[in-house]
Swiss-Prot record:
It comes from the Eukaryota. This is Coiled-coil domain-containing protein 184. Pfam families: DUF4677 (PF15726). InterPro entries: DUF4677. Residues 39-68 form a coiled coil.
Amino acid sequence: MEDSLLEIMTKDGGDMPAPLEVSTVPAVGDVISGEYNGGMKELMEHLKAQLQALFEDVRAMRGALDEQASHIQVLSDDVCANQRAIVSMCQIMTTAPRQGGLGVAGGKGSFPSVPHEPETPSPGIEDSGLLGRDPDEDEDEEEKETPNPATPTSHCELSESPGLLGEDGPLVEPPDLPDITLLQLEGEASL
């Protein structure tokens, strides 16, 4: 029968039918492994890019840290220089001979190199007769100027003191006070 079919087909002038192509279906394992390999390749490339960026950041940070370290070194050198200067100044101040500079121990605030001249009275004092006075008289005048503790000093005590009345004379008048003093005294009296 098959021979008759072949003869009919060849009589019609047709060609022999081509064999059917069988499509091969990939195995499930191959699909999974391909997906896995492709995903891992992408993941590795992504991680590589991230590591490269991280290395660049680390380099930049290291450069900044080196710069900061150089600034810190400069500041440290300045601090050490200032400290040495302070120590040397303290040594100079403690070992220098004390000659009374700046008026502390040298007398009247002058430098030790300036000689002190004795104070001479001006020519007008001799004319007034102060040089020819007796020193005892000066002491008596000083005693007169200092107030006696028994004598009252304030204006209120002056007016109430019985010692202000003379034996035969009138009452001693208090000195004229400025208006401000009178106002203060009136304020104290009202209290």
